[in-house]
Each structure stands twice: as C-alpha cells, then as structure tokens.
Amino acid sequence: MLLKVFIVDDEIAPREGIRSASLWDDQNFTLVGEAPDGEIALPMIADEKPDVVVTDIRMPFMDGLALSRAIKRSMPWIHIVILSGYSDFGYARQAISLGVEEYLLKPVTTSPGW
C-alpha cells in the first residue's frame, strides 16, 4: 500500500529535496501535492486526504503549528512531520501538544549512519 504524502514549505529547496529523495521508491510513499504555506495547503489537504503531511514550522499566512492544529482538529488520522530550522524547544513542545508525530531539525539527511 502506498502512503500518500503532502509537503508544505515556503522555500522551494526543501520541497525539491524531499521530492527528489530516494525514499519514494524504497518505502512505498507517493507525493500527492505540495504548497508554499498552510493557508494554501489546508484545502488541498482536505481534498487529497494524505496519510502524512510534512510541513515547515515558520511560513507566511499560516505557519506549521496553525496548520497542524487545523489538520488534527478536522483530519486527526493524518500523521504530521514538522521540519524546522529552529532548535528552540518551545516550538517542539507546542508541536507535541498538538499531536504532531515527528519534529525534525533541518537539514534532514536520508543517508545511513546518522
């Protein structure tokens, strides 16, 4: 079974990096959409109903925490992974309190041995 993934990040480079990662073929993931911020992403996520949303934490219009809150309220089955350039524990604590499954610091690598 393919897991559907949706990416939300205001920067193009992280979206391209995730999109081009080798994990898609190896782990049975399929990319179903992407958006530059939470405000644009939310209706797209409601339409696509992905299994996993990978989101940045700081974005214009609707940040990753607000997006996570909205997703968990209306689509609680969706797993959320936050990618953040901020190591401030306050962001991680907020994410955990919202039910976010993973909080990873950028840059993220898929290479073995990390």
Kindly give the residue locations of the regions a language model identified.
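Two-component/phosphorelay signaling modules centered on CheY-like receiver
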Residues: I12-G33
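Structural signal for short hydrophobic segments within the conserved structured cores
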Residues: F6, T30-G33, E102
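Non-catalytic signal-transmission and effector/linker regions of two-component phosphorelay proteins
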Residues: M1-K4
